[in-house]
């Protein structure tokens, strides 16, 4: 039996997507840490830039706002996507521990609840993937350990 480490660790990642890869990466990192450390949770940080895009992304639209195309996608995928989103939400609710919801204005102070914050995995530093300053952990107020786990970018320099 492993000796459990007594630390509070927060994971800052794209846990809120409706993408199998992103959600499963969040889950895998959570489970790995949870087996070794008491007090692991995914920080329920959802950038405001994502909230406005959630609807059209869930019905399979990118940036195509052709009216005929939008109506067709709504009729074909609307019901399926709302069910899929519910399933993702259910999976997150029952498979990982989430912190209370935080946003840009509360994240800085919320991080002080942790001894360590792990950023990643996935493309958390990619400009095309909603690169948010929060994922760079440039907060001077946070005195805990800052760790990058498999964080990557689609460009050579960030």
Language model region names:
Residues 1-3:
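Short, Lys/Arg-enriched N-terminal segments with co-localized hydrophobic residues
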């Amino acid at each position: 039996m492993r000796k459990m480490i007594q630390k509070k660790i927060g994971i800052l990642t794209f846990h809120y997507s409706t993408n199998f890869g992103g959600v499963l990466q969040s889950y895998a990192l959570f489970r790995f840490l949870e087996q070794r450390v008491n007090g692991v949770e995914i920080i329920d940080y959802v950038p405001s830039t994502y909230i406005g895009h959630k609807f059209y992304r869930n019905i399979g639209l990118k940036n195509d706002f052709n009216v005929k195309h939008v109506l067709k996608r709504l009729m074909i995928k609307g019901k399926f996507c709302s069910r899929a989103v519910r399933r993702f939400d259910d999976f997150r609710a029952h498979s990982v521990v989430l912190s209370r919801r935080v946003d840009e204005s509360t994240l800085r102070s919320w991080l002080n609840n942790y001894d360590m914050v792990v950023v990643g995995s996935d493309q958390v530093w990619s400009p095309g993937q909603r690169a948010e300053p929060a994922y760079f952990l440039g907060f001077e107020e946070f005195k805990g350990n800052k760790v990058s786990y498999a964080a990557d970018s689609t460009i050579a320099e960030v």
